[in-house]
Amino acid sequence: MSKKRTIALTISAIAVALGIGAQFYTNHKIDQVLKNFPYTLDNQATLNVTQTAKNFFMRELIFSVKDSDAKSTNVISTKLTALPFFITAESQLSDQLVRQLNKTLNITIDKNTINSKFSPVGDYLQSDILTEFRDFANKSQNLSIGLHFLKNKEVELKTTLSGFNYDKDTKLEEIDGEARLVPVGANQYDLSSIDLTAKNAEVALLNGENTHVYMKNATYHFDVKPGEADKRDLSTKFSSDILRVANKSRTTEESQATAGGLNLLVKQNGVPSSINFHHEFKKLSDGSLSIKDGVNLLTKIFTQNDRFDSSLSVLSVNVPKNNQPYFNLQNAGLELKLANTDLTKANVDFKLNVESVKQTPADEERKWEAKGGKVNIQLDDYNVANELAFVPFLLDTIAEKEAPAKDNKDFLNAKDKWVKEFSGKTNIEAALKSFNMADLVLDDVSASDKTETLDNDQYNEHITLSANKASYPSAGFQFEKLAIDAPFKINHSKAHLSARFCS
């Protein structure tokens, strides 16, 4: 045997040995990964895997998901091909999942391909999912999803959807989305962030009877950051260039309320990890959310946290009547901040600013316009818990068709508790640059009301009112440089509060 042939055979033998060794290593890594299952996803679902076939180069797997109701669904069947230091996978959606998706989403899946690559050395995974389907309107749509398992163990998903007609009331066009899952423990992932954009969206809430919403160039962002002691910090942003609201009496675009340049920001710090709004929002989307459920949901969003910060701004709002301009709002914004660590001594800060607002009914005498409106409300060390205690009674009153025959003892006890524990400071300020309605004219009007509870059953109240001009000729009065300053000290404040409550 020649020397060159001997060297070549030796090199080949080394290569085969290394390849076999790498193959053993690759299979070892696959076994390690499979042992990590099941995985928990955001406390809402469990991902499991079953190995149905195996040899030195190939594995066949079935992935299944079990939801919070313990219902299990096979989602993907995968054929792994293990090469030295490299793995490829060909996958397809299970027949069970395809049938479920077709039924749930009103679609027909025509084609679906899933291609994956995985390196056991670098712990890198990339999957591309391409789906062609026909929606409710029998329109062909394309969905692409890219999944990346990053080196820091985080999971990144990117998706593009050409469009989707779910039913006659819900339609989406050109949707792009990104989501990120982060590891929070052994075999457990939580949602970290979501970003969605839509060129056009038409959504029906509460069955669309009174809340049919159209959006153009809408964006949605949500992220979660871990806080202290099993708490999380949540942030939600929403914007839409145009938002139109329709109902059964406003069916044409010309008759619908329209908001332009809408921006919403909500931050909730210190939300207990045990709280999950998923089920409540699910009720909202399918129309089963009652008024009571809705109020309870809002109460949770506002108060079940250590701090709540929110802002809402809009460039314009137009509400027509009989297809004619009727109500117009320009450049309005509000802010609400709540310090909720102790709801018996909460701090509330509310601000509202409006550049201009006007109403133009057919009757000239009823037309009015206001400019430069401002409202500031501050509550310090205020017992919000006692205020919230009346919400269930209010909801019951709304539901009752007849007045109760006798007083509700629980309500009276709540009232007595409210009077006894009433405390804190309040500061309410309002200002208006101008107001015009027929011959009523107001110019530079401002008012304030400040209160503070004191010891010995007393509290202070200070009321002010000023106006540069107030003119109403048809009523026979006109004021200029009006100023009222009225400080009070109230004795027997508990009795006064009780009487004021009943009034």
Predicted regions and their residues:
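Bacterial Sec-dependent N-terminal signal peptides
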Residues: 1-6
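Glycine-rich, small/hydroxylated-residue low-complexity segments
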Residues: 24-27, 31-503
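Hydrophobic membrane-insertion alpha-helices, especially the h-region
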Residues: 7-23
